Amino acid sequence: MAIGLVGKKCGMTRVFTETGASIPVTVVEVDANRITQIKTNDTDGYQAIQITTGERRDSRVTAAQKGHFAKAGVKAGRGVWEFRVTEEELEGREAGSEIAADLFEAGQLVDVTGQSKGKGFQGGVKRHNFSMQDATHGNSVSHRVLGSTGQNQSPGKVFKGKKMPGQMGNKRVTVQGLEVVSVDAEKGLLVIKGAIPGANGGDVIVRPSIKA
């Protein structure tokens, strides 16, 4: 694992290359990620950096959270996240310090994790890309129905995991191997090629690509 950043999805736009090619990009706003705790093998059984970002009203922060943030000397954020790290990555990091957008550079590949948009209860055609049945030729009221879900007396059941209608979206999704087009450290912006999960304004986690 490696140190990443927590940011907010701003939306999509496009940028142009020197040759005039249009590239679809997503803009991620990265406020300072404040380190709230350094976890080590000796004290916690694993190595990680815990961070927070953004702000939260004082009335929304519990007494335990206030003590945790005060111990690190940072403002209360809208949540806490952890990144598993190696000993080398822990060097120079301490509670109270900050990690900014310049952690990444243009051309670097990243993995982006977010909460996908919820679509509610959907049928097999929309949820799993099933084919529709005949529109005519004797078919009635079954145009978007799944059809058979199994065999016969043997095995006499529907196997677990069978694709069926149900809740679609609102799940943790990671898109791998996206390219960082540009980084604006002053404004705290990451411009990433392609689409990333979630709605505008949602929290996203940006990490160095695990497959790079």
Curated annotation (Swiss-Prot):
Belongs to the universal ribosomal protein uL3 family. One of its GO terms (cellular component) is cytosolic large ribosomal subunit. The keyword Transferase does not apply. It holds the Pfam family Ribosomal_L3. Residues 147-166 are annotated as: Disordered. Coiled coil: none annotated. Methylated by PrmB. The gene is rplC. Gene3D superfamilies: 3.30.160.810, Translation factors. One of its GO terms (biological process) is translation. The modification N5-methylglutamine is found at Q153. One of the primary rRNA binding proteins, it binds directly near the 3'-end of the 23S rRNA, where it nucleates assembly of the 50S subunit. Signal peptide: none annotated. GO terms for molecular function: rRNA binding; structural constituent of ribosome. Part of the 50S ribosomal subunit. Forms a cluster with proteins L14 and L19. Transmembrane segments: none annotated. Keywords: Methylation, Ribonucleoprotein, Ribosomal protein, RNA-binding, rRNA-binding. This is Large ribosomal subunit protein uL3. NCBIfam families: L3_bact. InterPro entries: Ribosomal_uL3, Ribosomal_uL3_bac/org-type, Ribosomal_uL3_CS, Transl_B-barrel_sf.
